[in-house]
A protein has these predicted regions:
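N-proximal low-complexity "stem/linker" segments adjacent to membrane-targeting elements
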Residues: 1-26
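A conserved acidic beta->alpha catalytic loop
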Residues: 26, 30, 38-47, 61, ...
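Short acidic donor-binding/metal-coordinating loop in glycosyltransferase active sites
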Residues: 39, 60-61, 78, 85-88, ...
Length: 290
């Protein structure tokens, strides 16, 4: 019998006391090491992690998890790493498939299917179906390079072997994602700000044409190519929000290019307010004199 190499599980957290127990319960029976990297939670996340035997490390809050995830992977002891979000879990079917995958010698990096629950229901389309949303989650540390860029986190090194798994064969990570549209829009707004700042730092420039093209592509891809029209009202509204997300990135990038920051706008408004109020100067004295 070939013994599988040990696996380190990495989970990043920020106020995840509701979700984290499910994630930890799904990995504690097979993970050889659990590393929880917490971004200074205000709830009982850290206590829950330690109660389940996890090694806890800390990282500053960045507005998104990717920089902390890179740090957490650096804290692991083992070569094989499985990355899990705090609002995800690993079903038994997937857990049972892991030993065969890493001892089979077919790949150094695996893209694992993910079943997404959004707005209260599991999705099979929209680009968020299990086989549409395969994530790079199981890998040898030596086979990937890691960047802090949002949504562009892992990069497979040249020469590393990559394999995309199918949900019919191994199951899928279960992801309990956005609760409602309010939750969804709040996240999109935050992510759009981060993406705009990173694009600006790279020297990218916005244009109305680019915004229109990106928004239209999102519609065509999610609603038609990836079957969003089959998801009823969820498909329609989620596609609309994602299309608006692309527009928002370019809008926020335009603000950065023009120096139209919050501080600058507040300064401008204050100056305008003072200009209007200057019209009252002397009127109070005149009123009293009369």
């Amino acid at each position: 019998v070939t013994l599988r190499p040990p696996i380190s599980v990495v989970i990043n957290t920020l106020n995840e006391e509701r979700n984290l127990p499910f994630a930890l319960r799904s990995v504690r029976s097979w993970a050889d090491e659990i590393v929880v990297c917490d971004m200074h939670s205000d709830d009982k996340t850290v206590e829950i992690a330690r109660a389940h035997g996890a090694m806890v490390c800390f990282h500053e809050r960045m507005g998104f998890a990717d920089p902390a995830r890179a740090f957490a992977i650096g804290q692991t002891r083992h070569e094989w790493v499985f990355v899990l979000d705090a609002d995800e879990l690993v079903p038994r079917q997937l857990a049972q498939a892991l030993p065969g995958l890493i001892t089979g010698g077919t790949a150094d990096v695996f893209r694992v299917p993910r079943l997404n629950y959004l707005l209260g229901a599991p999705l099979q389309h929209l680009g968020w179906g299990p086989d549409q949303d395969a994530q790079l989650r199981l890998f040898k540390k030596s086979a990937v390079s890691i960047t802090p860029d949002i949504h562009h986190f892992f990069h497979v090194k040249q020469g590393a072997r990559e394999r995309r798994l199918r949900s019919a064969d191994v199951g899928a990570i279960v992801h309990f994602n956005y609760i409602d549209l309010t939750h969804f829009i709040e996240k999109l707004n935050r992510y759009a700000s981060i993406e705009a700042r990173q694009a600006f730092a790279r020297g990218e420039r916005a244009s109305f044409r680019k915004a229109l093209v990106a928004s239209a592509r999102e519609w065509l891809s999610r609603y038609f190519k990836n079957g969003g029209h089959r998801e009823g009202w969820r498909g329609l509204y989620l596609t609309a929000m994602m299309s608006m997300y692309r527009f928002a990135i370019h809008g926020k990038l335009t603000e950065l290019e023009t120096g139209n920051s919050e501080a600058e706008v507040r300064r401008r408004y204050q100056a305008e307010a003072e200009r209007y109020l200057a019209e009252y100067e002397g009127l109070h004295g005149e009123s009293k004199a009369s």
